[in-house]
Amino acid sequence: MHAEILGNTVIPSSENIIDSSRTPILLLRAARAGIPTLPSLVTDSVKKIITELNFPVVIFAVNPFIYDGYKIANNKSALYRALKSLGMNYKFAVCAQPLRGEMLSFKSIFGKCEQDEESRIISEKVYELFKIPLCKLHVQKVGKKVYLCGLQPLRKDELSPHDMQTISREIALISQQGEHFGV
């Protein structure tokens, strides 16, 4: 943030980091940019989730300091457990989405991933929009269609030697294109 205040270009921007770490804002911005998303509901009410989305549902934390991914609830007791866990003992709301297909989580490195074509397109579009170089994307595959559901930071222990080579190659490419890339 200090570099941004001084007028330096920072990738990703503080705004993009904050927005992408809050699932409802991530989904809203993604949908506005044409990235496929599913309907979502931000609430702390089990009753509202059941009434509006029914089962099964995917639950994401709204609190940006919880990086537990998501929880799937197929019944009321699982939904209560998910809200208690991801809502920090019901102190925070959660973001609920209908589960219509299969959940898939994968690494996105500078918008590249080793997935099917639809997932690669989502990865590229998310990178174009938020400029988050390293993240884990959570998507839902419904038939042949893929929908963005969430994003979370990658932990260092999740990066393989191959990933590190990809990162080095991408940084070298950015530098060759004349863009300043500070770490």
What spans do the regions from the language model cover?
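A short acidic, often aromatic-flanked loop/helix-cap motif at beta-alpha or helix-coil junctions
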Residues: I17-S20, S45-I50, F65-Y67, G101-L104
